[in-house]
Amino acid sequence: MFEFVDPEAGFTSSVIRDPRRFVGRADLIQNCMNALNAREGVIAVYGKRGVGKSSLLRQLQQMANGNYDIAQKAGLLHLVPAKPRRYYTVYYACDSNINNTDELIKRLCNDTDPEDGLLRLVPDAGKELAEFSRSDETSAGLDLKLVKWGVKGADSQKYASVVPNDTIQSFRNFVTSSVDANNRLWSKRDAVLVLLDEFDVIVTKQGMGSLIKSLTSPTVKFGVCGIGQDLGALIKDHKSVGRLIEQGAIHVKPMSPAETRAIFTTAEELFKHKVSFEKGVVDQIVEISEGFPYFAQLIGKASVQYGNEIGTNDIDKKIFNEVLDKIRSGQSFPNLEQQYQLAVGRSDERAMLLVLLAEQKGEATLYNDELGRVVLQRTRSTAQGMGIQYIDQLMPRLVEERYGPALVKGEDRGIYEFADPVFRAYVKLRKLD
């Protein structure tokens, strides 16, 4: 009997924080455990879009706070130390409005998020705000000028102070004082862990590596996460933290087929077995999603939504083919469809060229980073055979920033890469109008 179900109960396109929803990645979880329990070091989580970096970072944060449920789920509980290092954690998702290191540090020092913000580490008990004022737009000074704290029976001490016109030193004061300050009030933890997600979007990251190196100690640890095929793409001056990052470099690659299948067995459990996916359907989604959990989650969610619309909880081949028809016609995924329309414009020829590039077979093996690269020359003869005559006039829109871009130029002439590999997988599905 059909029962309406919330698609979000089993599938989500958001960052996964709940360990029960997290699937696979046992090797990466083990790497995270090793990095967290190292006395010193920097953690760097990097990889392509859509592979689940932010979700992994949130699992790392859970373990840093002392919750090792994800390790138990991954069968790694025997590797958890008798006394694992515990952290006060700060999490901040960067955005493209942050131009440089100084602006990032200013954001961190003014973040009042109750769960993840740096300022929440100022103890509430006995907290005194000595001065608060708005800085001039041209000043590098921060809004928070001085915070004092103290508990009855203890000396009132200066917790953290902002040095006018010196954002970096102000940040140093905050992070180096936070562990001692909070250990006076709560059960003791070993260090503070500052996690910077989407670190790659910061325009100029020069100097961040040396700042991280100078602050890293047994009581202060940093973790950065973002898009990049190597550490150099994520941290420009990564050589300054080379020794510290050795154990904490965590490269997130596309999922194996078995891990992608586990997304659907996990979803069925979360749906309390009210929803079922035929094995052949799951196999097809595994192939279509190409190891990107974000895309697999989107397709799963769309399937359950369509099941609700027609009154069924059983996603078989017939139902899934109807779901695919909606995806191929651009009705299911508004964000990916918007990317597609922006890239091709009103040109049928450009749409055909984009599909040819997306479908180009790579020489590298599957689940290898080289897979994303396409060679324009390999597509020319096929494109011309389909009547696409002016390829060089069609390409600029595909690489221009204002239209996406759909493609980014490689180091060698005529070599390109899809900026978003999930978008590439979508283009392969999308039928030409």
PLM regions and their residue ranges:
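The catalytic "switch" region of P-loop NTPases
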Residues: F4, E8-G10, R184, K188-L193, ...
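A short, basic N-terminal segment
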Residues: M1-Y46, Q62-L76, V80-R85, D433
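An amphipathic alpha-helix signature
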Residues: T101-C109, P257, R261-T265, V282, ...
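Short, conserved phosphate/pyrophosphate- and ester-handling motifs at nucleotide-, phospho-/glycolipid
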Residues: R25, S54, F292, D420
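Glycine/serine-rich loop-strand microenvironments at binding/catalytic pocket rims
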Residues: V23-V51, I212, T216-P218, G345-L353, ...
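C-terminal leucine-rich, beta-strand-based interaction scaffolds used for sensing/assembly
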Residues: P7-A9, R328-D433
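P-loop NTPase nucleotide-binding core
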Residues: E40-V194, D200-V203, V220, S381, ...
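A conditional alpha-helix N-cap/helix-loop micro-motif detector
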Residues: G24-A26, I168, T204-K205, E278
